[in-house]
Each structure stands twice: as structure tokens, then as C-alpha cells.
């Protein structure tokens, strides 16, 4: 099936933040409970070992992505830190993720462009369910930026460019209607955009189908990385990993410098970055969490 770039509604700057946040909250809820990225934990763990780092910079984090379930799995092999970022940061969702992870998940409240990550944001970069949003030129820029700044990068996509994946997307409006009452924190705007004016179910379906049509397959990922491998000490791994009983595989791309010491030399700079940016999380603990969260309640 041919790849189409197309346009997703969630990417548009004119979309109200309340709608975008409702979308990312739903996606994060479903990701947490279905755990589609559990199969790639060994690959990600191996990449972290190759780069000799336990610091992750998650790009295009949406509502915090899969990290509430992935972090405990990765934490078993050693302490680590995760910094959530996005071009349109869902700060309330980031605060909630930080609270539920006891501060392990930190965030940047300002916009971060995945194609040009600030120099002081250092760590192994990850993109979950977001790489397909970018055109080939933008996707190349994301990978090139990681290569130029000598940072490892991992791309993971649970969507698939196939007839089966598109057919499964037609179930999503029903899932939105069923699970929205269970999504926390409660927002009146989420009920408005889901049940009164059903924008969220429509956008989840529309963007889901478009996401499938935009998803890069392994061959296309190899084309994107081909020239980046020329003349650089950078290693790429591309493949698919299927979970037991899962209808579709997860497509992944891993890239990292072969000279890991070039990353190690900047870890002190990363610590400074986390100390400076983590003010956001301390505000979450002192103000946001007690009013809105109860750990004894359902997580999501």
C-alpha cells in the first residue's frame, strides 16, 4: 500500500487546546491499558546500553505516551530519567504523569520542535506513535538532528499501513464513547467534545486512518537513514516486533553513535538541564496533585 502524507486534524494550530488535550488524553489512556509497546522493551534497553545512558528525551509526547507503563519495565535494569516534550505540550497530562511516577517522568512546559531539539536537551531521544506525522523531509531532519548532535534515537510505531489496520480504526469511535468517563483527570470540556459535540470520536477515527496511511514501513525507514549512515559513526537498526496475540507488529528504528563516549561527555550538562526544567514537576507536586489526584483511585 502506497504511503500518503495527508493531514491530521490534531496537527493543526487552529485546533482548540481543549480538543487536542482530550485527544491526547484518550490516546494515552488506551496506550496505558493496552500496552502496545511492551514488545520493544528489549530493543530499547539494548539501545540504552549501547549509548551508555539512562536519560531519555521523549519527543512528541502527547499525553505522556506509553511511559507510565514503559518506565517501570525499564527501571528494573537500573535507575533512569525521562523528560517529556511536545510541540503542543499537554502540561496537565505531564503533571499527572509526573505525580503518578513519583517524579520519574519530568517535562518541559515550553514547545519543543522534534526537528531541532535545543542543544541543552540531552539524552536518548524517543518518538512513540508520532514519527508518521512528519513528511519525509521533516523525518529526515529529525534523524539528521540526532546524528549531528551525537544523540541516540528510537522511533516506534504501533500503527500499520495495511487494510487490517484501517479496518480496526473503525472501532475507535465506539471505544472513545465507552472509555471517556474513565479518563482522569476529569474535564467538563472532554464530555462536551465527546458527547454533546462529538468532535473527539470523529477526529480519533479520521486521524487514526490517516496515521495508518502515513506510517513508514521498514523499507522506507531504511531509505531515510541510508545517506545518514554514509561517512558517520552511527549505527541503525530497523525492524518489526509483534507481541503474542497482537494483530499488528510494532515498527521500530534505533540509531546511536558507535562512539558512546561522545554522549557521556555531556551527561553533566543533562543533569543541569533536568534540575532547571524540573521546576515544573515540583509545582505539580505542591499544587496540582493534591487537588486532582488520588493514588488509591484508578490510575487512569
Question: Language model features by range: what are they?
Answer:
Residues 150-161:
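Conserved beta-strand signature within the Rossmann-like core of class I S-adenosyl-L-methionine
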Residues 1-53:
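Class I SAM-dependent methyltransferase Rossmann-like catalytic core
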Residues 280, 292-294:
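Intrinsic-disorder-associated, low-complexity terminal segments enriched in Asp/Asn/His/Tyr and depleted
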